[in-house]
């Protein structure tokens, strides 16, 4: 590099003499591109973030120095690097933050202004992403006082070129401008706000390496606070060299100072450097892979970076999932060390005498934080580890765990070993933590954050940081589990009754809610193992409950819930809930009301904890309907199917009589519909159909009617017409082109050869919908599309989401017999545009009759179920089933 710089200097000198401006720009641009290429090659040959930062910073310094000299900026001015460039941490495509510091004057002269504009223009011509400000010393101080971000940026400064004297004045002024208490308050609040922006979790599918909780910005915040404290300490020191050390480039001297001052240990620093390096490597690879400043670890680049780092897809775990686990474990550690260091620095600054309140013989509340009376308590008595979390639940005045206690927890968590887990006292305390009336969610989250939960439950420890790239889950397995538990806790709070009134009412009367929390902890604990995670988790749960002394019936309930935790959502979203046989079968499965209530509460909490996109009012209504129907079936001893049909006929007749419709007018309609019709449709639908169709029993043209769904989100659409083979395909095409998705389709054929189909459609865009004129549009336009004189349109091929493109999900097709002449077709696939329309087309091409369809979208994944047979209830042969399955697989 030094030889290249000297050659560059000679070449520039000759070009300047000749006045060749364009050649000068090309020379610097080539120097930059060649240097950047060499830095990249060296990095990929031997990945070392520190070396890359050093070389990249030197390269840019050289270019800026020549540019500064070329533009003949005032000799009393200085070019100062600030921010990431100032601290010498320059990633491949990071912006260059520059401060052009001018001597005090009333205004920048016209000549100076021209030279500065020339400099900035030159830097842009060179392809550098520059963010610059031009200020005098007094303007710097004014901005720093008004804006904490500006002040922070100015603290991380370095003289690139120009006047050293004015730079020294700048350092002195910045040091004096820092009001340490205010700085700490604002920076901690800034971090809290940043955490809130990312929903207080680092464990998202596409985290921001720089800004997400536990990311590089957490390390920066630690160093900003340390630098501010060190600068303030230096400003009180008579030795001017001490102040220069405080402003020194990079963080090495800051870490050293923390160790000298006994604020951080060498072991802690070693771990910090390890995890910092992981994040820096990922961000560097991300910049190179994206060819721009990209800080989000998006799907587009996860696989490529995982392959570069040597991760392989094995045993059902994607390489990208392994990469993300490494990332999540690093940010988990950084979050903890961030908490330890900030608490330590705040404690260091405090001059107030401690306020101490004794709780018991082992613990105090010191300045609102829990503290042990003896520093060696946890080492000598590991059982007290659980007391830390139990006491925070029992004493709401405690704001958190003191830094000393937090540090001790990190040191002793290795004592949560086999002997600890086998202790009857510790088992009792763990169940006691789960049984507290308040603070269960906070306690378990803290136990997970500090590594205690995974040590006590090794099977939980294995899923910490484990991501699932399945187009459905958006959190790591451990984060999802704790989200489910948090949702259960929300049911316990009367002030949140408005969210889920039924859940709150059921939860308030449920004995032993800690059993629900245990089921939540175990329901996905076997994810990532070979085999069915529900069955494996059930075994773990039963063993855990037995070893913790729970009564047999309680342990069996927890284990049953874990094994059955997908059953209620699957039934609600894949089966026809108006079919009494479905309800009867599900009632026999759950057996009693206690199980039903527990499974309902767990299911709602589980779906809500999976992804913000998955839960909606439609799913809420399905689950609530299944709960109510099943509860009714359990409460009645008579055969539920017979009872349901009789009740529906009676209630529909009463409803129709209120509008003056007598039984004699719709008897023929009901007779032609057949007895099975009353198993497929509910009272409200029967009365709706009867009112509209009684005059049109033998309609010659399609009848389409639409209304707002009386039971929840969406629009309910009824289609009545003579049976035709492409009917379902035409309907799917129509709604697909409207950007509506079908939530449910009830397909029924009357005894006189008419199709009576009812659809629930939902807005696919997530936007608010104006229903003014929409219902009439559907009635008119869909009727036109069903006219046989028009040709069947091909399904649309719209834009797929990035996740669907970049996270391959193998479609799963399952066809199985459910009755003598009926099969169920289950499809799990990426929710690509036009998916349902394509499936409908395939069913038509294979002469398949459809009786019912339940369409379920879970994030970017579709889970669809269809009841099918051959034409006119002809049973499908094995050959036809194979052909149908192959056709769907080929299309998906």
Spell out what each predicted region is.
Residues 88-115, 260, 476, 504-636:
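Divalent metal-dependent catalytic cores for phosphoryl transfer on phosphate-bearing substrates
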Residues 43-56, 201-211, 370-374, 426-432, ...:
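Active-site flanking loop/helix segments enriched in acidic
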Residues 57-65, 71, 110-165, 281, ...:
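Conserved catalytic core of two-metal-ion nucleotidyltransferases
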Residues 278, 311, 317-321, 325-370, ...:
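Regulatory modules associated with amino-acid/nitrogen control
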């Amino acid at each position: 590099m030094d030889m290249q710089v000297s050659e560059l200097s000679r070449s520039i000198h000759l070009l300047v003499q000749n006045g060749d401006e364009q050649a000068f720009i090309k020379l610097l641009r080539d120097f930059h591109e060649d240097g950047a290429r060499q830095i990249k090659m060296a990095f990929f040959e031997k990945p070392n973030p520190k070396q890359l930062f050093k070389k990249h910073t030197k390269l840019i310094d050289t270019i800026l120095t020549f540019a500064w000299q070329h533009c003949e900026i005032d000799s009393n001015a200085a070019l100062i690097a600030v921010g990431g460039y100032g601290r010498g941490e320059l990633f491949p495509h990071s912006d260059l933050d520059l401060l052009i510091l001018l001597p005090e004057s009333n205004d920048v002269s016209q000549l100076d202004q021209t030279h500065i504009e020339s400099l900035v223009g030159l830097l842009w011509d060179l392809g550098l992403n520059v963010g610059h400000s031009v200020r005098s010393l007094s303007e710097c101080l004014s901005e720093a006082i008004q804006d904490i971000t500006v002040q922070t940026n100015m603290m991380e400064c370095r003289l690139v070129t120009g006047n050293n004297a004015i730079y020294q004045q700048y350092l002195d002024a910045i040091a004096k401008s820092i009001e340490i208490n205010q700085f700490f308050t604002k920076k901690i609040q800034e971090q809290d706000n940043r955490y809130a922006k990312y929903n207080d979790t680092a464990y998202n599918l596409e985290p921001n390496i720089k800004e997400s909780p536990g990311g590089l910005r957490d390390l920066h915040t630690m160093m900003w606070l340390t630098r501010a404290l060190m600068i303030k300490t230096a400003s009180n020191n008579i030795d001017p060299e001490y102040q220069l050390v405080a402003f020194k480039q990079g963080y090495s001297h800051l870490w050293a100072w923390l160790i000298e001052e006994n604020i951080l240990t060498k072991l802690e620093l070693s771990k910090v450097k390890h995890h910092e390096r992981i994040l820096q490597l990922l961000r560097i690879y991300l910049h190179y892979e994206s060819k721009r400043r990209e800080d989000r670890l998006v799907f587009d680049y996860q696989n490529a970076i995982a392959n570069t780092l040597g991760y392989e897809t094995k045993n059902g775990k994607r390489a990208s999932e392994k990469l993300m686990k490494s990332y999540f474990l690093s940010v988990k550690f950084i979050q903890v060390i961030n908490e330890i260091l900030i608490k330590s620095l705040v404690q260091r600054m405090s001059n107030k005498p401690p306020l101490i309140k004794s709780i018991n013989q082992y613990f105090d509340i010191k300045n609102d934080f829990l503290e042990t009376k003896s520093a060696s308590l946890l080492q000598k008595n590991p059982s007290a580890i659980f007391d830390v979390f139990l006491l925070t639940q029992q004493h709401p005045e405690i704001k958190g765990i003191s830094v000393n206690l937090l540090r001790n927890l990190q040191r002793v968590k290795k004592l949560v070993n086999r002997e600890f887990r086998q202790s009857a006292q510790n088992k009792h305390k763990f169940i006691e933590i789960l049984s507290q009336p308040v603070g269960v969610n906070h306690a378990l989250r803290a136990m997970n954050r500090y590594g205690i939960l995974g040590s006590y439950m090794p099977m939980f420890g294995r899923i910490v940081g484990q991501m699932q790239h399945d187009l459905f889950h958006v959190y790591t397995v451990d984060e999802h589990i704790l989200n489910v538990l948090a949702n259960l806790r929300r049911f316990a709070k009367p002030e949140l009754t408005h969210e889920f009134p039924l859940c709150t009412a059921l939860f308030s009367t449920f004995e032993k809610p800690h059993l629900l929390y245990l089921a939540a902890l175990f329901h996905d604990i076997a994810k990532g193992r070979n085999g069915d995670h529900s069955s494996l988790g059930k075994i773990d749960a039963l063993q855990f409950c037995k070893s913790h002394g729970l009564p047999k019936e309680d342990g069996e309930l927890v284990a049953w819930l874990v094994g059955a935790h997908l059953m209620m959502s699957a039934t609600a979203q894949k089966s026809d809930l108006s079919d009494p046989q479905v309800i009867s079968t599900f009632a026999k499965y759950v057996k009693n009301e206690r199980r039903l209530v527990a499974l309902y509460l767990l299911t709602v909490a589980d779906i809500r904890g999976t992804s913000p996109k998955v839960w909606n009012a439609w799913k809420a209504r399905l689950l609530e309907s299944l709960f109510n129907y099943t509860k009714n079936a359990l409460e009645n001893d008579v055969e539920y199917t017979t009872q349901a049909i009789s009740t529906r006929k009676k209630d529909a007749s009463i409803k129709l009589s209120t509008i003056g419709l007598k039984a004699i007018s719709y008897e023929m309609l009901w007779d032609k519909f057949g007895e099975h019709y009353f198993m497929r449709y509910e009272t409200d639908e029967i009365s709706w159909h009867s009112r509209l169709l009684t005059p049109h029993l033998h309609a010659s043209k399609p009848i389409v009617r639409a209304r707002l769904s009386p039971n929840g989100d969406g629009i309910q659409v009824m289609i009545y017409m003579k049976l035709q083979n492409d009917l379902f395909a035409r309907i799917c095409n129509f709604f697909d082109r409207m950007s509506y998705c079908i939530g449910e389709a009830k397909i029924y054929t009357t005894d006189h050869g008419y199709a009576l189909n009812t659809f629930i459609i939902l807005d696919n865009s997530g936007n608010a919908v104006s229903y003014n004129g929409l219902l009439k549009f559907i009635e008119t336009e869909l009727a036109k599309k069903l006219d046989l004189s028009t040709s069947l349109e091909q399904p649309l091929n719209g834009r797929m989401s990035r996740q669907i493109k970049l996270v391959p999900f193998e479609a799963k097709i399952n066809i199985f017999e459910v009755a003598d002449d009926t099969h169920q077709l289950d499809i799990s696939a990426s929710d690509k545009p036009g998916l349902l329309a394509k499936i409908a087309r395939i069913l038509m091409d294979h002469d398949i009759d459809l009786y019912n369809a339940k369409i379920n979208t879970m994030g970017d994944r579709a889970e669809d179920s269809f009841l099918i047979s051959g034409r006119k209830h002809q049973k499908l042969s094995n050959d036809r089933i194979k052909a149908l399955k192959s056709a769907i697989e080929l299309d998906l």
